[in-house]
Amino acid sequence: MARRKLVYEGKAKTLYEGPEPGTLVQYFKDDATAGNGEKRDVIDGKGVLNNRLSEFFMKGLGNIGVPTHFIKRLNMREQLIRAVEIIPLEVVVRNTAAGSICSRLGIEEGTPMPRPIVEFYFKNDDLNDPIVSEEHIIAFGWAAQQDLDDMVSLALRVNDFLSGLMLGVGIKLVDFKIEIGRIWDGDFMRLIVADEISPDSCRLWDIETGRKLDKDVFRRDLGDLADAYTEVAKRLGIMPQGPVGAIKPTLIN
């Protein structure tokens, strides 16, 4: 069998050339990293859970008219996605203080934000993804002002959807990050949500207990990461059948 062409390999996902022009296959790995890759481990079943969870969130966004790169899930670890031109920015929405904003601004963890705050970070591992202003983004040509306005609008729509969804299953959406890409329909360019939405890219706290159900479990050595992600999947009704760790990757050619 012919091997698929590798397009890109990141810390948690691998992209392969898709079966049709303009498509890619996104493979979710079991690798867990923190501190820009300084802390690493392999968590059995993490890729399976993130594939299912990201599919669930992307489908839900599509159902309310938020465009995403998701086409369909192929198997337990892979999904077919649209190829996009990724804007080199991480878009972060914060509802509650946690993570870097606490140390940067001296805010106590758990403090509610007065309103959802949208931040931009330049995607560059060598620089540890520094926070940047809209002035930087426009001056360096990463995105135009209209793009930025559209990105903020997209991010806030994602926030409204995820916040309500999580609230319904007893989880607080503390913050999340997304990536946004450009696609062209003829001469018309539009922006869509890309990458993934999963507990790798969100902070999720149990509303009653404050238990962390996201990658902070790994960052802070708070317990079993797969257990936390499984709890999120169970509450949302998308828990895969059978023991997650026993599910092996299925390659397609």
Curated annotation (Swiss-Prot):
It catalyses: 5-amino-1-(5-phospho-D-ribosyl)imidazole-4-carboxylate + L-aspartate + ATP = (2S)-2-[5-amino-1-(5-phospho-beta-D-ribosyl)imidazole-4-carboxamido]succinate + ADP + phosphate + 2 H(+). InterPro entries: SAICAR_synt/ADE2_N (IPR028923), SAICAR_synt_PurC (IPR033934), SAICAR_synth (IPR001636), SAICAR_synthetase (IPR050089), SAICAR_synthetase_CS (IPR018236). CDD domains: SAICAR_synt_PurC. The keyword Protein biosynthesis does not apply. The keyword Nucleotide-binding applies. It is an enzyme of class 6 (ligase). Pathway: Purine metabolism; IMP biosynthesis via de novo pathway; 5-amino-1-(5-phospho-D-ribosyl)imidazole-4-carboxamide from 5-amino-1-(5-phospho-D-ribosyl)imidazole-4-carboxylate: step 1/2. Its EC number is 6.3.2.6. PANTHER family: MULTIFUNCTIONAL PROTEIN ADE2, SI:DKEY-6E2.2. Belongs to the SAICAR synthetase family. This is Phosphoribosylaminoimidazole-succinocarboxamide synthase. The gene is purC.
